[in-house]
Amino acid sequence: MSDAAASRVPASGAAAGAKFWFVQLADGISRSNFATLLYSAFTAIGLLAFISVSTPYIFNVYLKIPPAEQGQIAGDLAAWNEAALLLVFGPAGILADRIGRSQVFTAGFIFMGIAYALYPFADSVIALTGYRVVYAVGVGLATAMLQTIAADYPRNASRGKATALIGTLNGLGVIVLTVGLGGLMKTIVARGQDPATAGYMVHFLVAGLCFISAAVVAAGLKKGTVVSKEQRPPLAELVRSGFAAARNPRIALAYACAFIARGDLVVIGTFVNLWGTNAGMAAGMEPAAATAQGRLLFGAATAAGLLWLPVMGYMLDKVNRVTGTLICMTLGALGFLFTGLVDDPLAKESLIFFILLGIGQISAFAGAATLIGQEAPAASRGAVVGLFNFSGAVGILFCTAIGGRLFDNVGPHAVFEMVGSLTVLVVLFAVWVRWKAPGSTTTGGGFMGRRAS
């Protein structure tokens, strides 16, 4: 894929081949466009991940659900979430290719804000599920656009470094917004408010941040579509293009990676938080304090991935993309499988396994995102990335629906061992693709990256 394929319509005031720090930008992309992308990477993932802190709090404070029943309900909520995403990702990608990325991204933040404002008012699991579906529509629109724009804006030579920078902002967003806002509920309770009032206050704050972010992306992202109106494929061709692209073995591998990697953050967020929260409740902690324990485990995994990501981004620009993906998915498999060694998640000696989990998760994400970013054609990139996200949603739907029952009936570690075992299958597929269809080396050069033809 040529650099020009990343963006064919120059933006007003954008210098050809502009550079943002160490990232070379595609033609027509301004520094302010890329800065807005980084802002959205910080807020979108951080705000969507807050649901993993919010849901156990809703269970314990508002709905009074017994801990023994929470795993299955959490898994069912995540499954409904992913079922809604399955219906959103495809149309989101097609809309992005037809009307533009910024409009779709803006709508995603608005839906997320509405859902968070409603979430603490749920008076039953059914109502909570309905609000979760509204949230899922917003997440589907926002994450589809984040992934698509992340493929649009950098030149191919900087794609790995851009993925690392965007992933770093993702991780910072999770730590600052999810961990910080989750801790705010405990702080408010400590200052004399009851837990229910604290929950309302923080959820309204999160909703407000979603609406502010909608305004920022509407103003700051590049307007219009990636190709001119004359170059746009017909709508029917766009719909078919995501499936047709899978004839490229590297895109097929990216879709398989998405089945695991695209949803790792959701799987980790749902079950690491729940594991830590339930362990805290079993130790006699109050709901806010127990939620904080789950949040700390999630934060440790996220922080580890954040520190590891620059290393992974540098490596991905030095090796063949398929080789890089193979390395990343291997780390992902190891990270998930090693959680089987955890007995007490709150014990100090268990922390290393959550650190490895975070490294594995972020590696799988970076490898999959870099590969699809290189291989997706410019004219139908939204549709191809939409199917990439669709594959991720199918994976999350499978893992969370089965995982919730494994969590309750086998043990918390079983969820992660299942994901790790599935990741091993993707690793084997990556070995086959590296052998049969490795594609060209990256433009960054380096070890293990010679052109294979």
Model-derived features: where do they sit?
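Cytoplasmic membrane-interface "Motif A"-like loop-to-helix N-cap segments
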Residues: R98-F109, K318-M329
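Intracellular juxtamembrane helix-capping segments at the cytosolic ends
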Residues: L141-R155, S363-A376
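Juxtamembrane intracellular "pre-TM" segments in multi-pass secondary transporters
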Residues: D3-F34, K223-A256, F447-S453
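C-terminal ends and interior cores of transmembrane alpha-helices
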Residues: I110-D123, T330-D344
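Pair of pore-lining "gating" transmembrane helices in MFS-fold secondary transporters
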Residues: Q24-V61, P249-I268, I355
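Central cavity-lining transmembrane alpha-helices of secondary-active solute carriers
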Residues: G75-G93, G299-V311
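Helix-to-loop junctions at the C-terminal end of transmembrane segments
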Residues: V88-G100, W308-R321, F407
